[in-house]
Amino acid sequence: MKYSVCLDALYPGVDLAQALPDIREAGIDTVEFWNWSNRDLAALEKAVTENRMEVRCFCTEGGTLSLPQSHDEYLSGLEHSAQIAHRLHCRRLITQTGPETGDHAQTLRNIEEGLKKCDEILEREDLILLVEPLNTRIDHPGYSLVYSEEAAELLERVGNPRIQLLFDLYHQQISEGDLLRHVQNCLPWIGHFHAAGSQNRGYLEDGEIAYSYMFRKIKEMGYEGCIGLEYFPNGERGFNRLPELK
């Protein structure tokens, strides 16, 4: 189990030539980010290569899974995002599922149908798609996929091992709590974690989530993947207090 750093959260507006050596100095060799279309991809590619780092994942762009009329646009965006992933030697893409359509059961069927349409692209491009539930109470009102075990049941119906769950500990603490039980129940589908303090999405130790304990228990469950650090350091940039958790 290792950490990756979300550049958009920890290093907003910081030049990659400054951010990546800082991350390397902290003993972390893996980064992730949100959107690719607003980035200087040549500069990112150069900085990652020079600092011998891995791009773990980033978000696919275009279309909406919860809206059937948008599935063709979604698949086109997935194709384009796949080419960017290959350029960055990245094997994982993050997807959100889009807005609730009014009928939740139908919304889930729409998402399931859209995800099943991704099979051919993911197989051909040798990629993993990470589906992310989000909280609707604070950050994403109207979002379609909220609860971790509902997401796991959805992925079981989709039935493609290349389509996995992104379990965001911050979002799930707000949405449902009881994190370790939900992690244990969802573990066969989890391909990535995100972490942030439950208080204002700040430092990991800000709020009621005991992250040192949480990370230890997740590792004991047998998880060998990555935990993405997606917290916002309260007006500062970079790690600062992260070493206390390592």
Predicted regions and their residues:
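Histidine-acidic metal/acid-base catalytic patches
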Residues: 1-27, 49, 83, 89-91, ...
